Amino acid sequence: MTYCFDVDNTLCVTEGSDYRDSTPIKERIDYVNSLYEDGHTIYVLTARGMGSTNNNPIKAYAKYYNLTKEQLDSWNLKYHDLFLGKPGADIFVDDKGCLDKDFFSPKV
């Protein structure tokens, strides 16, 4: 199975756009790592930088890819690929969506 996880306020706590001070949610990182270890594919998708670049994924990538990758690696998150460029939105409607609190609540 393939899973795609958001970063801010899903895998870590982030206040506003203060990404440098994001703190990992260890229980969630551990659970994602267990999915990885069980052979699932793990993608990380974030909207970091999309608001400040007028939803320009190339500029968002240039601005935040290295910081985000360094954070994920320092948190020991196991994943297959990191994607920037998720459009900024207040609500995502998706037939395969799941609220983070619902996904993680019975596990952590």
Q: Where are the regions a protein language model picked out?
A:
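Catalytic phosphate/metal-binding cores of nucleic-acid and nucleotide-processing enzymes, i.e., regions
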Residues: 1-108
